[in-house]
């Protein structure tokens, strides 16, 4: 592997350089020959090389044009990925699906400074993917997989768990990166739920969840009183106890609440 390119702090770049960890990540992604794979932020191609060994259809979206030559050089012995020098947040997944209805496998060492926007983009496209394996700050992964009544349980937990089965499948120490980040990392697996709960108004669901967690120490009654007043709804008639805080409600509770309100 060549590491000629200096990592850019502004893009949240930290390049993987431990071959054992790299192999393990790709192995856990369980990529098959006929899978269409889309890697987000391949950087210098650490993961890409091993993905090319597994699949005949490897696509990468890389925002930083300055790393692409090195990426392709590092991949030479393994094959050639199709490179899109674009911002993933504006990228159309249907481009790599071509005319097929085949779903994609997503993988990537995500830039930590924009991981949340990327995750929300993946939510929007969840019907087009088989699964996703992302390296993220461990603290973020812990928030995503958190359960109710936990300090780390929040908006991201509820929204992602509505769409996906979420699990942390590998811990990754800072020393396997160049440059070393100041935090631990982890691999998050997202698998779209086969039977999602029905929501009458999904945008309203997102708004209710966001508003409920707006001030964590406040009760649902205080956080939602403006919305309840606007809808002319008596808090005592709701299917959840408004004296509770948002962190006490399960994802299913939020769905029940939203379907009652709309």
Swiss-Prot record:
Coiled coil: none
SUPFAM superfamilies for this protein: S-adenosyl-L-methionine-dependent methyltransferases
Domain of life: Bacteria
Species the sequence originates in: Francisella philomiragia subsp. philomiragia (strain ATCC 25017 / CCUG 19701 / FSC 153 / O#319-036)
Role noted for this protein: Specifically dimethylates two adjacent adenosines (A1518 and A1519) in the loop of a conserved hairpin near the 3'-end of 16S rRNA in the 30S particle. May play a critical role in biogenesis of 30S subunits.
Name used for this protein in its record: Ribosomal RNA small subunit methyltransferase A
SMART domains in the cross-refs: rADc
Keywords: Cytoplasm, Methyltransferase, RNA-binding, rRNA processing, S-adenosyl-L-methionine, Transferase
Catalytic activity entry: adenosine(1518)/adenosine(1519) in 16S rRNA + 4 S-adenosyl-L-methionine = N(6)-dimethyladenosine(1518)/N(6)-dimethyladenosine(1519) in 16S rRNA + 4 S-adenosyl-L-homocysteine + 4 H(+)
Gene3D superfamilies: Ribosomal RNA adenine dimethylase-like, domain 2, Vaccinia Virus protein VP39
Pfam family, one: RrnaAD
Lineage: Bacteria, Pseudomonadati, Pseudomonadota, Gammaproteobacteria, Thiotrichales
Residues holding S-adenosyl-L-methionine: 14, 16, 41, 62, 87, 109
A GO term for molecular function: RNA binding
EC number: 2.1.1.182
